Amino acid sequence: EVVVVGYGVQKKKLVTGSTIEVKGDDIQKMNTTQVLGALQSQTPGVNIQAASGQPGDGFKISIRGAGTNSSTAPLYVIDGVSGGDINALNPADIERIDVLKDAASCAIYGSAAANGVILVTTKQGKMGKVQVTYDANVGWQNMYKKPQLLTAKQYMAVQDQVSYNNGGSAYDWSKYIDADLLNAYQDGSNAGTDWIDAIRNKNAIVTNHSLNVTGGNDLSKFSMGVGYQYQDGVLGNVVKSDFRRFTFRLNSEHVVYRVGKRDVIKIGENVYYQHKQNQGVQIGNQYSNVLSDMLRANPCVPIYNKDGNYFMYDDLKNSGSAGWFAFNSYTSNPIASMVNNQSGANKGKSFNLNAVGYTEISPIEGLTYRGQIAYKQWSNSWRCYLAEYRLNDQGASRDKDQLSNNVGLGWNWTLTNTLNYKFNIAKLHHFDTLVGMEYYKSRPDYGESVNATVNGSIFKDFAHAYPSLADGNAVASVVTGEPAGYESKLSYFARVNYDFDEKYMLTAIIRADGSSNFSPDHRWGYFPSVSAGWVISNEKFMESTASWLDFLKLRAGWGQNGNCNLPSSQWRAGFEFGEYGVYPFNDKTSNTTGAYPNRLSNPLLAWETSEQLNIGIDTRFLHGRLGFTADWYSKKTKDLLISIQANAVSGFSTQWVNGGTVENK
């Protein structure tokens, strides 16, 4: 059995680093729309949490804890290409996933691997007759455990107690609540408004459809997949919340020239396309979001008035101010607010295209050159319409409707060249060597984004929510745009795997990364690693345990990884054009727009470095029916890249520096 490692594969029993393998069948069994959702509970040492609970939204993931001040997301390598979007993949397209957890395993990826590496292999072509497979499943989702909220009776008791504590008396609730309804509240026959239940979408549907076609012969193989996923939100009753995605995948490999059993020249490609649409309730943060609004809402008041319109707290004003405050008047009707704000009418769309082409040349036995170029293109758009409304006099209103439209697109490319040589000495000494280089490029002319916001539209609905349809009295129109960021990265790497009779293993890796995010004096970072393993079960003195002990391996490793995750070109000063850059020059009666500095330079910025020591044991018992793996590790990250408050006399608010240390064990 082999596992995927950086830029190649290796026998599983010879791996000296800490890795996890998850097979595609185990992912597909989970029946989820997201790959990372399927990995939950299958990857020890990897913490995976939903970012928001919104259908189709991504996940927060950390491998062995948070070791950096920036994002804890690992590096995703999809079909040999770094930096892919795992959230764009259809779980049914996955052949296998390998997780590299320690620095000894990750060092081959250098600066991008400080948070670990997740290697994704999509389904490849297989030799044999053409096979067509269609998988479909339909399920329903419900809120597993609903928060226990105060009933109307409990809420009134709490408010009365608050009044007592402030030196007052109990409220006369009959002033604000209909007599029959008040009696029902007080005797417990009516618990009041359950705001969470009001927005809960019971039996929210989730469905997956996947069509896969594979086939080929000894010279040509292919695999094609088409998928469609749809998911309803469990909090999408009043405002629609859903996610839908279409995916297409085509992988093929062809032997161009063969000598005997050796494939001298092979070519292939991996193409993946995704189109996604989503809409949903406003997420916000832990203090400002739809769910928290429902949790704080008063159970004594209804969702609707008797006339069928949304209940408004201003309706209670004439009944007496003391009781009015007991109804949390400064919090508007949360469902009405949800409908009239961003949750009410919004839609996001995105397109992703990943294309990889490669050539493999094997001029002699054991020597293989691989040249690969990867192209990524993406675009996204988001539209939102906010209608005119008034819920109370405390600010929960909008005098003019508002529409927003954001569009962005971009592309980048990566060139990778590797040379792999495998050879043996005296049959017992096995060597697997690799050298390579990689170049990544993204430039301002490779993409851009444009954002527009207008107050006042002609048609007053979401279907026509475009800036070009603003009315003649539109105010506060804001249009902004910017090019894609500039970043280039050049890397060189080498690896040597050695084993003696598959009992004693040694791996050494070195990678050098140069990034445009740092000044020429600090541009290059060097990240080494070394690891060793001992397959004890292969020793002669262990022969007596062969009936119950299948495999026993000790391993240890040390390595370094880097991180350059910060906005581009922070090491040098920047300039900006705008309202703060106006100059009178020779005419004191009018100003001319010019440039002004917008950030402090720091030419001393350098690589953030993560150093890790790992010791582990792998065992298998009873003919593979029972397995056990344990790891001890110590990870220390130094020279953290952080944005700190700048000295006030500089005229700037923040500056990027290296500072701080984080340790994980």
Feature map (PLM): residue ranges:
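Short, small/polar-rich motifs associated with maturation and membrane association
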Residues: 1-250, 255-258, 262-267, 354-355, ...
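Extracellular/periplasmic, surface-exposed regions of secreted and cell-surface proteins
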Residues: 27-30, 73, 79, 203-208, ...
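Short, glycine/acidic-rich hinge or "gate" loops at secondary-structure transitions
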Residues: 55, 282-287, 388-389, 542-549
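A contiguous, mid-domain pocket- or channel-lining segment that forms the substrate-recognition surface
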Residues: 85, 305-308, 380
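Conserved small-residue
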Residues: 133-187, 277-306, 314, 440, ...
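Acidic/polar loop-and-plug regions of large Gram-negative outer-membrane beta-barrel proteins
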Residues: 169, 174-191, 274, 279-352, ...
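Core alpha/beta catalytic barrel or barrel-like domain that forms the active/cofactor pocket
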Residues: 291, 390-392, 507
